[in-house]
Amino acid sequence: MDWQTTSADTAPSSFITEEQDRSLFGKPPASGAWKESDPVGGRRFAGIGAFGFESGESLPFVRIAYETWGELSPARDNAVLVLHALTGDSHAVGAAGPGHRTSGWWQGIIGPGKAIDTDRWFVAVPNMLGGCQGTTGPTSIAPDGAEWGARFPFTTIRDQVKAQAAFADALGIGRWAAVVGGSMGGMQALEWAVGFPERVERLAVIAAPPHSTADQIAFNSVQLGAIRTDPLFHGGSYYDEKDGEGPHQGLALARRMALITYRSLSELNDRFERTWQSGISPLGDGGRFAVESYLDFHGNKFTRRFDANSYLTLVQAMNSHDVGHDGSGLAAALSRVTATTLVVGIDSDRLFPVDGQELIASHLPAALDGRVPLVVRSHFGHDGFLIEDDLIGGQLRRLFAA
């Protein structure tokens, strides 16, 4: 795969060229979020009204940005909800262009004749609550005329699914033919099946755990700290700052940390080894190792399309994830799932290891593969679910045939 022609979130690790480095010359914006003055692109918008959070806080109005593919049947019984990962958005299919800084993140999975066949299914992909690509989040304008920023309510996975349920109501969809999600989207998909079992016919949970772990929270805490300790973060009030004067260094550092967990040990070692970038020694001569250049490039690129407050909001939502946190416990929560379920793990995933998917599958009443997950072999680690179209697509075809 030529990673230069694919979405930034689906790119296998590779060397960075001088041309790519030059493409990021210039100061990054204070926030890389989509703005109302930007082109709409393929987005549509659905208002869901006032919204109450688990924390007890509320917003007077919430809007969901989304994109769709395929045609909704007259009976409204062919709708598929696809949920994106932490830094994804509604643009699952399509080229980069006005309104969309990256190309679609699941183009090999969604489309005519593909695993999620848009000749048969109506596919809806919303940007999650708290995101920064059109759905209400920290970059949205509060009633006082300023961005919500750090004032945005603490958001949980359950809050995000509640907003998605209201979004489904706005579309007139009472029951999804399938809910599909990977990574953070997989957390939401699982929460859908637990919280709204009567509204989910099929379920795919890909590379996601039943709850966050201490190890995952620890990695996340360092990323949160990188942003909060950036001297240009200003407690989350940076939206009026000039280009180059926002918390881009902290956000880029958080992204670099995250990328390490998204890739496998073997992929990074095999691709980069101890190679120098541009032939300049990193051993005292001011150069960088190639893997450092890769992380720097993608960290800096990320600041052009994401927002620091939104990143904090969404990472903390991931930390909140626990499908049994209502007091019933994990086993009781998962026993409520009635959907025909596909649970997929990736053998090289070091962000959400396979033991999490094993825990999910062991308590599900109607999993396709019984009490064990389907584990795919991939060189790419956690991001294999975004890269391995044939492997992941083949499993999704099984689910949609069920």
From Swiss-Prot:
AB hydrolase-1 domain residues: 78-388
Active-site residues annotated for this sequence: 183, 349, 382
Record field: compositional bias (Polar residues): 1-17
Keyword terms: Acyltransferase, Amino-acid biosynthesis, Cytoplasm, Methionine biosynthesis, Transferase
Pathway connected to this protein: Amino-acid biosynthesis; L-methionine biosynthesis via de novo pathway; O-acetyl-L-homoserine from L-homoserine: step 1/1
One of the GO BP terms on file: homoserine metabolic process
Chief subcellular location: cytoplasm
Group of enzyme by EC: transferase
EC number: 2.3.1.31
UniProt-annotated binding residues for substrate: 255, 383
InterPro entries: AB_hydrolase_1 (IPR000073), AB_hydrolase_fold (IPR029058), HAT_MetX-like (IPR008220)
Entry GO terms, CC: cytoplasm
Membrane-spanning ranges: none
Catalytic activity from the UniProt record: L-homoserine + acetyl-CoA = O-acetyl-L-homoserine + CoA
A Pfam family the protein falls into: Abhydrolase_1
Region feature Disordered, mapped onto this chain: 1-39
GO terms for MF: homoserine O-acetyltransferase activity
Its biological purpose: Transfers an acetyl group from acetyl-CoA to L-homoserine, forming acetyl-L-homoserine.
Family: Belongs to the AB hydrolase superfamily. MetX family.
Official protein name in the record: Homoserine O-acetyltransferase
Organism, scientific name: Leifsonia xyli subsp. xyli (strain CTCB07)
